[in-house]
């Protein structure tokens, strides 16, 4: 009787980390970020369309919780990226394309960090930030001016 062997290298080759691909962890963090962004946008649209009341408050808690989760995932993603550099650009790519790619990535990361930060800074208006109703994030000192500026910046983003 011959031992059972299963050939997986050809099927899993596209998923295997290599010098020319992002690691599986980087790919998973990327797609988790995408999923969270896709989830938060309709939540925001529904939340702002609701009349003030308990239902809008529940949506706000969920919206803020998604924002906190996005922030945490992006921080983990950046830490991973710092310890696991991106694969090199395709050979022959024009230098200007590499520069555009790097600038675009930097701006996306900045936006992914600044949106949750400005959202959290809005709590300087005195409202606590609850994470899924499980616990509150540390309360910022009440500062109406900071809350107002954060509100404007968050809405511009």
Regions found by a protein language model. Name each.
Residues 1-157:
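Membrane-embedded alpha-helical bundles that constitute the cytochrome b-like, heme-associated redox core
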């Amino acid at each position: 009787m011959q031992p059972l062997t299963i050939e997986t290298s050809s099927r899993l080759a596209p998923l295997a980390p290599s010098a020319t691909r992002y690691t599986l962890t980087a790919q998973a963090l990327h797609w988790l970020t995408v999923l969270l962004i896709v989830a938060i946008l309709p939540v925001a649209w529904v939340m702002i369309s609701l009349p003030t009341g308990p239902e809008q408050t529940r949506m706000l808690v969920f919206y803020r919780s998604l924002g906190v989760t996005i922030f945490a995932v992006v921080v983990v993603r950046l830490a991973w990226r710092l310890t696991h550099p991106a694969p090199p650009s395709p050979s022959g790519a024009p230098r200007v394309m590499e520069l555009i790619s790097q600038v675009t990535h930097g701006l996306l990361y900045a936006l992914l960090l600044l949106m949750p930060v400005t959202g959290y800074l809005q709590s300087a208006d005195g409202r606590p930030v609850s994470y899924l109703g499980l616990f509150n994030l540390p309360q910022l000192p009440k500062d109406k001016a900071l809350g107002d500026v954060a509100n404007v910046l968050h809405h511009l983003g």
